Amino acid sequence: MSASAVYVLDLKGKVLICRNYRGDVDMSEVEHFMPILMEKEEEGMLSPILAHGGVRFMWIKHNNLYLVATSKKNACVSLVFSFLYKVVQVFSEYFKELEEESIRDNFVIIYELLDELMDFGYPQTTDSKILQEYITQEGHKLETGAPRPPATVTNAVSWRSEGIKYRKNEVFLDVIEAVNLLVSANGNVLRSEIVGSIKMRVFLSGMPELRLGLNDKVLFDNTGRGKSKSVELEDVKFHQCVRLSRFENDRTISFIPPDGEFELMSYRLNTHVKPLIWIESVIEKHSHSRIEYMVKAKSQFKRRSTANNVEIHIPVPNDADSPKFKTTVGSVKWVPENSEIVWSIKSFPGGKEYLMRAHFGLPSVEAEDKEGKPPISVKFEIPYFTTSGIQVRYLKIIEKSGYQALPWVRYITQNGDYQLRTQ
């Protein structure tokens, strides 16, 4: 069982718009939602599911709005929450910003969307590209020439319309990897993983089939134990367009892509990652009157690669003042509102080492800090490089008209949650 009704409320709990799907819950029940929420908040016992009598309120907050679903039955809670977040996504794609004003300005479209998104309490069409075939930005049905059913009715490929045409046929594919890293104050790597995704922008005419081949090193977690130099991907998720049966048979990623931008696949690699940018810091406090920092940054990737827009965020005491900086490269900025200094290096080639010194005055005499010190965090982006070693071997584009298309492939490695603790 799913939702009985869905409401959008303002911050005071006033109903802006609602839709009754099953008729088994009194629509006035939502009046109890805000008092219960405030009571639980005061008690410090706030939860995403609230109850009044036999009615359950499942809710999320977005900007200055509450999205609430009610149910009297034994609802599938994860499905309801997934649906509420999907509603936020669809509304945001239609109105750019989902807030009270956009709700008030678009009542007609929202009612139409709510009718398509859910039927009798069960989620139905939640893909915004499909919805845009039924419901235009002005809230009217599409009418181009003679009336015709939407492409999704006649077409087995629901995520792509027929009759798409481009003067120039192109495909852009980005392999993006984010490195999550946590290093102890002693220099030991406590946690390291790679979170990757393959994102595409497709501008192709007709109904093309694409075939993507990755390098032989890449294995997927259900293929068994691989060779020592293989890349075993975990938590692999594909876009709905990928033919999973073919992938399970011969590991070919074959698909008819949606038009425009989408994420083809995502993956995770839980492995020991050599820190791409290594930070060593020496912090000296002198009689509570001043504090000195010596920070060394070293790039530990191949010399032919370069990290761009590197930012090293170094925490400093709240009461520090009178900053003085000296660095071999880049620039240093004190950000007092964040209690940190930011060392910025626009271009950081592989195999290089740079030094930065900072000096602060400490006007107040306080006892030694007993709380843990915040870690140093690093931001960076390395183009033409993947930490995992994943590579696109080929990207074939097959379309019955036989046109030539240009595939463009790009690799980017960037920081995720990248932190190094200090002594």
From Swiss-Prot:
Name the Gene Ontology biological process terms: endosome to melanosome transport; intracellular protein transport; melanosome organization; vesicle-mediated transport
Q: Where in the cell is it found?
A: Cytoplasmic vesicle, Clathrin-coated vesicle membrane; Golgi apparatus
The protein's UniProt keywords, in alphabetical order, are: Acetylation, Cytoplasmic vesicle, Golgi apparatus, Membrane, Phosphoprotein, Protein transport, Transport
Q: Does the keyword Protein transport apply?
A: yes
Residues with the Phosphothreonine modification: T152, T154, T223
Q: Which Pfam families match?
A: Adap_comp_sub, Clat_adaptor_s
Q: What broad class describes the main subcellular location of this protein?
A: membrane
Tell me where in this chain the PTM N-acetylserine is found. S2
GO terms of molecular function: clathrin adaptor activity
Q: Show the InterPro entries listed in the entry.
A: Adaptor_comp_med_subunit, AP2_Mu_C_sf, AP_mu_sigma_su, Clathrin_mu, Clathrin_mu_CS, Longin-like_dom_sf, MHD
Describe its membrane topology. Peripheral membrane protein
Gene Ontology CC terms: clathrin adaptor complex; clathrin-coated vesicle; clathrin-coated vesicle membrane; Golgi apparatus; synapse
Coiled-coil annotated residue ranges, if any: none
Location of the MHD domain? 168-421
Instruction: Report which superkingdom the organism of origin falls in.
Output: Eukaryota
> How is the protein modified post-translationally, according to the record?
Phosphorylation of membrane-bound AP1M1/AP1M2 increases its affinity for sorting signals.
Q: Which family does it belong to?
A: Belongs to the adaptor complexes medium subunit family.
Protein function: Subunit of clathrin-associated adaptor protein complex 1 that plays a role in protein sorting in the trans-Golgi network (TGN) and endosomes. The AP complexes mediate the recruitment of clathrin to membranes and the recognition of sorting signals within the cytosolic tails of transmembrane cargo molecules.
Question: Subunit arrangement?
Answer: Adaptor protein complex 1 (AP-1) is a heterotetramer composed of two large adaptins (gamma-type subunit AP1G1 and beta-type subunit AP1B1), a medium adaptin (mu-type subunit AP1M1 or AP1M2) and a small adaptin (sigma-type subunit AP1S1 or AP1S2 or AP1S3). Interacts with MARCHF11.
Would you tell me the protein name for this molecule?
Answer: AP-1 complex subunit mu-1
Instruction: Recall the taxonomic lineage recorded for the source organism.
Output: Eukaryota, Metazoa, Chordata, Craniata, Vertebrata
